Every structure is written in structure tokens, then in C-alpha cells.
Amino acid sequence: METLSQDSLLECQICFNYYSPRRRPKLLDCKHTCCSVCLQQMRTSQKDVRCPWCRGVTKLPPGFSVSQLPDDPEVLAVIAIPHTSEHTPVFIKLPSNGCYMLPLPISKERALLPGDMGCRLLPGSQQKSVTVVTIPAEQQPLQGGAPQEAVEEEQDRRGVVKSSTWSGVCTVILVACVLVFLLGIVLHNMSCISKRFTVISCG
């Protein structure tokens, strides 16, 4: 298999959608990877799943679905890294008996415990009462590593964000100093031009 960049590891090379709990990275017998949605669409038109790159056949026993193919562990290791986000997704159960994943801010003042009732604003200025539902770690989709590793990765990510913010501030200050210096040179030259007919030279 050819070497892929990390960005291409994050997306299905057929539909170019990012892998997610709905679009799981499935490993074919030929060791190529594509999302479960694309494989399901291929399976509806064919009896077996044929790799779009090498044409290798991945046979599924009768009654088996694409979801029972193994996930690609290399891709899962890449996409399990938390991405920069100000909110942590929390599963909530709405009164309409649907289950949604909404980003709820985590703060001590506004935190909801499992089973607590609360009210959250949804798009379109709608208010819905919600009940927080916790999902055991072993049932959460696409979670990799132990909770301690996740905490360490989050701390590393925050360190990178703080570092990049600080370097951005330093860059702005440096550019401002250079501009002030150049403005001083221009003003000095302008004052010398206005005095060129005097005996005093600007040096």
C-alpha cells in the first residue's frame, strides 16, 4: 500500500468524508481502508465487496454486514486523538426519544450530572429540556486509549495552543516595533528635507 499523508488517513479515499462513528474506517482483506458507508453502497450492487484500488475481493459470509468487517487500527489510532475544540461532546436524550450528541460546555457552575434535567438552547432559538445520559467508556464510539492517556493528550494539546497563541502575540509586537521604527525613519527624513536650505545638516 502506498504511503498516505496523515490528512488522507483521516478521510475515506472514495467519498473524501472524514471518518466518524457513522463512517467507520473498515479494513478490507487486501489491507486497503474505506468508510463503512461506501462499502455498504458497494455491497448493495454486488454480492461481495471488491476493493476499488486493487480489485481484491473481500468475501462476507451470508448474513454478515459491512459493519462486521474489522476497523483499521492505524486509522483509529490517528482519529482517536482529540481535535482542537472548546467543548466536549456529551450524549443527551431529548424528550422526543431521540439521542443526539451536542457540544455542551463543561464548567463547574453549569455542569449537569447524569440524570439531571436541564435546558439548553438549540439552533433557531429553540429550547429543549434534556437529560444527561452517561455512556460507559467501553461503549463509546471510536475511543482509543485509557482515560489517563486522553487527559495527557488534552494537556499536550492545550500546551500547543498556549504556545502558538504566545508566538502569535510576540509576532504582532515585533511587527509593531518594526513599523514604529520605519515610521521614525520616514519622519526624520521628512524633517531633514524641510531643513535642507539651512546651515544645519541632518546626519
Swiss-Prot record:
Widely expressed. Gene3D superfamilies: Zinc/RING finger domain, C3HC4 (zinc finger). It catalyses: S-ubiquitinyl-[E2 ubiquitin-conjugating enzyme]-L-cysteine + [acceptor protein]-L-lysine = [E2 ubiquitin-conjugating enzyme]-L-cysteine + N(6)-ubiquitinyl-[acceptor protein]-L-lysine. Ubiquitinated. Autoubiquitinated in vitro, leading to its degradation by the proteasome. Its EC number is 2.3.2.27. The keyword Zinc-finger applies. Residues 106-165 are annotated as: Necessary for interaction with RRAGA. It is found in: Lysosome membrane. GO terms for biological process: apoptotic process; cellular response to amino acid starvation; negative regulation of TORC1 signaling; positive regulation of autophagy; protein K48-linked ubiquitination; protein K63-linked ubiquitination; protein monoubiquitination; protein ubiquitination. One of its GO terms (cellular component) is organelle membrane. Keywords: Apoptosis, Lysosome, Membrane, Metal-binding, Transferase, Transmembrane, Transmembrane helix, Ubl conjugation, Ubl conjugation pathway, Zinc, Zinc-finger. Its main location: membrane. A zinc finger (RING-type) spans 12-55. The chain crosses the membrane at residues 167-187. GO terms for molecular function: small GTPase binding; ubiquitin protein ligase activity; ubiquitin-protein transferase activity; zinc ion binding. It is a single-pass membrane protein. Pathway: Protein modification; protein ubiquitination. InterPro entries: RING_RNF152, RNF152_C, Znf_RING, Znf_RING/FYVE/PHD. Belongs to the RNF152 family. Interacts with RRAGA (inactive GDP-bound form); stimulated by amino acid starvation. Interacts with SEC16A. E3 ubiquitin-protein ligase that acts as a negative regulator of mTORC1 signaling by mediating ubiquitination of RagA/RRAGA and RHEB. Catalyzes 'Lys-63'-linked polyubiquitination of RagA/RRAGA in response to amino acid starvation, thereby regulating mTORC1 signaling. Also mediates monoubiquitination of RHEB, promoting its association with the TSC-TBC complex and subsequent inhibition. Also mediates 'Lys-48'-linked polyubiquitination of target proteins and their subsequent targeting to the proteasome for degradation. Induces apoptosis when overexpressed. This is E3 ubiquitin-protein ligase RNF152. It comes from Homo sapiens. The lineage of its organism: Eukaryota, Metazoa, Chordata, Craniata, Vertebrata.
